[in-house]
Amino acid sequence: MAKGQSLQEPFLNALRKEKVPVSIYLVNGIKLQGQIESFDQFVILLRNNVNQMVYKHAISTVVPARNVRTAPPVPTETHAQSSEEFGNI
C-alpha cells in the first residue's frame, strides 16, 4: 500500500460506512455533494440523485458534513527523534 493510500483509505472508508454526506471540491472549483458509495485507487463513486464517478486526480478537497472516526494513525518517526539518533546533525 502506498503511503498516500494509508490516510485516504481509512478516511474514505469511514465516510462510506457511516454514510456521511460529503462535499467534494474539484480542482476546477466545482462542488459536488452526496454520499460515498464506493472508491478504489483512482475513482470515488458519489451518490446523490444520480451516481457520479469522480476521478481522484480531479479532486481538490473532501469535506465531510460531520467529524468521522478513523483508525488511529500509525506512529511515525519525528524529525527530533531522528536528529537525536544521529547526534543532532
Swiss-Prot record:
User: Keyword annotations for this protein?
Assistant: RNA-binding, Stress response
Residue ranges for the region (Disordered) are: 70-89
Q: Name one Pfam family in it.
A: Hfq
Set out the biological process GO terms recorded for this chain's protein.
Answer: regulation of DNA-templated transcription; regulation of RNA stability; regulation of translation, ncRNA-mediated
Q: Which portions of this protein are annotated as coiled-coil regions?
A: none
Q: Which GO terms describe its molecular function?
A: RNA binding
Give the matching Gene3D superfamilies. 2.30.30.100
List each copy of the Sm domain by range: 9-68
Gene Ontology CC: cytosol
Q: List the disulfide bonds.
A: none
The record describes the protein's role as: RNA chaperone that binds small regulatory RNA (sRNAs) and mRNAs to facilitate mRNA translational regulation in response to envelope stress, environmental stress and changes in metabolite concentrations. Also binds with high specificity to tRNAs.
Assembly state and interactors?
Answer: Homohexamer.
Q: Indicate the family of this protein.
A: Belongs to the Hfq family.
Q: What is this protein called?
A: RNA-binding protein Hfq
Q: Which organism is it from?
A: Alkalilimnicola ehrlichii (strain ATCC BAA-1101 / DSM 17681 / MLHE-1)
Gene for this chain: hfq
